[in-house]
UniProtKB/Swiss-Prot annotation:
Gene: guaA
Lineage: Bacteria, Pseudomonadati, Bacteroidota, Flavobacteriia, Flavobacteriales
Domain Glutamine amidotransferase type-1: 4-193
Protein name (database record): GMP synthase [glutamine-hydrolyzing]
Entry-linked PANTHER family: GMP SYNTHASE [GLUTAMINE-HYDROLYZING], GMP SYNTHASE-RELATED
Native organism: Flavobacterium psychrophilum (strain ATCC 49511 / DSM 21280 / CIP 103535 / JIP02/86)
Pfam family, one: GMP_synt_C
Catalytic activity: XMP + L-glutamine + ATP + H2O = GMP + L-glutamate + AMP + diphosphate + 2 H(+)
C-alpha cells in the first residue's frame, strides 16, 4: 500500500483528527511518533507536523529530526510544529499575553496563495496554544493573521513548507478541510486514490502473497471489525481460514446462536464454542476493571488456544484490530500515555508461536464499514453498533455474577430493540446499558423496593476517537424506562448518561 502522507505525532489530542480529515480526502496517511520517523521516506508525498501540549521554549521540548524532510518533501506544520520551525530556524516564539484557546477569525489572508484558495476572509479557525510566533523564521512570509495572532500562518520562501498556528483538523475550523486539500492536492500533488475498492483489491492481493497456502485462525466476535477481516481473508485464502466464535457468557441476549448462524450463512468456515460458564467462574469476585479485562483476555486466549490446537499446522493468527485500537493502546515516549488497556490489541502469549496478520489495522471504523459494503456484507450486520471485546463485563460495575449478567442482558435487549422499533438505531453510533453497583429505593404497587439502578448510554461518533451523547426523544426515554422497570425483575430506576468523549470515555470501565 502506498503511504502517501506521513503525520508526526507530538502528543496532541487532535493528531488522530488530522488523519481522519486526510482520509476523508481519499488520501492514505499514517501516524508515527515524532522520534520514530521512518527511515525510508521515498513512499511519502507530504509530511504534517502535529500539535503538542509541550512548549518549544521549555527544556523538555520535543525535537524531531527533520533533516531528511525539510526542503525535500512538502511540509505542513500545525500549531507546535509551526512554532518549532520558527523557534529553531531564526524566528522567535514567546508566551502569549493571553492563552489562545477557542474560535478566532482570519482578519488577513495574503492574496493569490494556493493554500488559501476558496477560503474567505474572516474564516473561523480553532486556536489551542499558550505561545505565539513573534518573529517569523528565516525566509518566512506571513500568509494570514487573526485579531490576536499576527503570524497565524506563514510559508518558507524557497521551500514547499507551510505553517499554521491553528488547527485545521478541528470541526470548528470551518475551512480547515479546504486548507488541507489545498496543501495536499494542489501544492503537494498527493493522489486521491485511497478508496474502499482500491483497499480491497490491494489487501486481497497482499494477503494472498503473504499467506500463500498457510492456515490462518481468526477469533470472531460478532462485531463489524472481525467480520470484515474474516470476509477479506476468506476472499484471499478461502478454506485455509479457520474461524472460532467464542461465547464468553457476556454477549447480548441470544446473540451467540443468531450470529453463529449468520456466519455459517455467509459461507465462513466457523466453529462456535460455548465457554460462558468458564468465563463467569474465572471472573467471580473480581471488581477491578483492569483485572476484569485481563482475566477475560487470559481466559479467551486459553479457550482459543485449546481450539486452535485442534487445527493442524496453523501458522497465522488473524485479528480485527483497527487504527483507533492501535492509537489508544500504544504508549508514545514523552507526549502520550496509555489510558486503559485495549481489549483488541496485545495479549497473545509467546507459547502460541503464531504470526499475526491484521488486515484492518490501518482503517478507522467508518472505513471498515465502507470496505464491508464493498465486500457485499449484509447491511444489517455492517450497521451493528460497536461492542466491546470484554462484553457486558465492563458494563457491570463491580463484581460479576450470572444474575447480574441476566439482568443486564434483559435491560440491554429492551433498550436496543426499542431503538430499532422507533427507527433510532441507525441514528446512533453506539448504545448500551450499564448496571450500576448501587440500589435505590422505589415503590411498586403498595410495596417499598430496594433494587438495581441502570444507566442507558447512546453516543454519536465517526470513529470512536471522540463522541457526543445523543439527544434521544424524551417520550422514547420515558417509554424505555417504563418498559425496563416493568419487564426486568430487579431494576427500579433508569438514568441516562449525557457525558461526551472527552472527557468521559464511551464505556464506563
Amino acid at each position: 500500500m502506498q503511504h502517501n502522507v506521513l503525520i508526526l505525532d507530538f502528543g496532541s489530542q487532535y493528531t488522530q483528527l488530522i488523519a481522519r480529515r486526510v482520509r476523508e480526502l481519499n488520501i492514505f496517511c499514517e501516524i508515527f511518533p515524532f522520534d520514530k520517523i521512518p527511515t525510508d521516506l521515498s513512499i511519502y508525498k507530504a509530511v504534517i507536523l502535529g500539535g503538542s501540549p509541550f512548549s518549544v521554549r521549555s527544556e523538555d521540548a520535543l525535537h524531531p529530526d527533520l533533516s531528511e524532510i525539510r526542503g525535500k518533501l512538502p511540509l505542513l506544520a500545525v500549531c507546535y510544529g509551526a512554532q518549532y520551525l520558527a523557534h529553531f530556524s531564526g524566528g522567535e516564539v514567546a508566551a502569549s499575553n493571553t492563552r489562545e484557546y477557542g474560535r478566532a477569525n482570519l482578519t488577513y489572508i495574503k492574496e493569490n496563495e494556493t493554500f488559501f484558495e476558496n477560503v474567505n476572509l474572516n474564516s473561523q479557525v480553532w486556536m489551542s496554544h499558550s505561545d505565539s510566533i513573534k518573529k517569523l523564521p528565516t525566509n518566512g512570509i506571513k500568509l494570514a493573521s487573526t485579531q490576536d495572532v499576527e503570524n497565524a500562518a506563514y510559508k518558507i520562501e524557497g521551500e514547499t513548507t507551510y505553517a499554521i498556528q491553528y488547527h485545521p483538523e478541528v470541526f470548528h475550523s470551518t475551512d480547515g478541510k479546504q486548507m488541507l486539500e489545498n496543501f495536499l492536492v494542489k501544492i503537494a500533488q498527493v493522489p486521491q486514490n485511497f478508496t474502499p475498492n482500491a483497499f480491497v483489491s490491494d489487501m486481497v492481493a497482499e494477503l494472498k502473497e503473504k499467506l500463500q497456502d498457510d492456515k490462518v485462525v481468526l477469533g470472531l466476535s460478532g462485531g463489524v471489525d472481525s467480520t470484515v477481516a474474516a470476509v477479506l481473508l476468506h476472499q484471499a485464502i478461502g478454506k485455509n481460514l479457520y474461524c472460532i466464535f467464542v461465547n464468553n457468557g457476556l454477549l447480548r441476549k441470544n446473540e451467540f446462536q443468531s450470529v453463529l448462524d449468520q456466519y455459517k450463512g455467509m459461507g465462513l468456515n466457523v466453529k462456535g464454542v460455548d465457554a460462558g460458564d468458564r468465563f463467569l467462574s474465572e471472573l467471580a469476585g473480581i471488581s477491578d476493571p483492569e483485572t476484569k479485562r485481563k482475566t477475560i483476555g487470559r481466559v479467551f486466549i486459553e479457550v482459543f488456544d485449546d481450539e486452535s490446537k485442534i487445527i493442524e499446522n496453523v501458522k497465522w493468527l488473524a485479528q480485527g484490530t483497527i487504527y483507533p485500537d492501535v492509537i489508544e493502546s500504544v504508549s508514545v515516549k514523552g507526549p502520550s500515555a496509555t489510558i486503559k488497556s485495549h481489549h483488541n490489541v496485545g495479549g497473545l502469549p509467546d507459547y502460541m508461536k503464531l504470526q499475526i496478520v491484521e488486515p484492518l489495522r490501518m482503517l478507522f471504523k467508518d472505513e471498515v464499514r465502507r470496505v464491508g459494503a464493498t465486500l457485499g456484507i449484509d447491511a444489517e450486520l455492517l450497521g451493528r453498533h460497536p461492542f466491546p471485546g470484554p462484553g457486558l463485563s465492563i458494563r457491570i460495575l463491580g463484581d460479576i455474577t450470572p444474575e447480574k449478567v441476566q439482568i443486564l442482558q434483559d435491560v440491554d435487549a429492551v433498550f436496543i430493540n426499542g431503538l430499532k422499533e422507533h427507527g433510532l438505531y441507525d441514528k446512533v453510533w453506539q448504545a448500551g446499558a450499564i448496571l450500576l453497583p448501587v440500589n435505590s429505593v422505589g415503590v411498586m404497587g403498595d410495596e417499598r423496593t430496594y433494587e438495581k439502578v441502570v444507566a442507558l448510554r447512546a453516543v454519536e461518533s465517526t470513529d470512536g476517537m471522540t463522541a457526543d451523547w445523543v439527544h434521544l426523544p424524551y417520550e422514547f426515554l420515558m417509554k424505555i424506562s417504563n418498559d425496563i422497570i416493568n419487564k426486568v425483575k430487579g431494576v427500579n430506576r433508569v438514568v441516562y448518561d449525557i457525558s461526551s468523549k472527552p472527557p468521559a470515555t464511551i464505556e464506563w470501565e
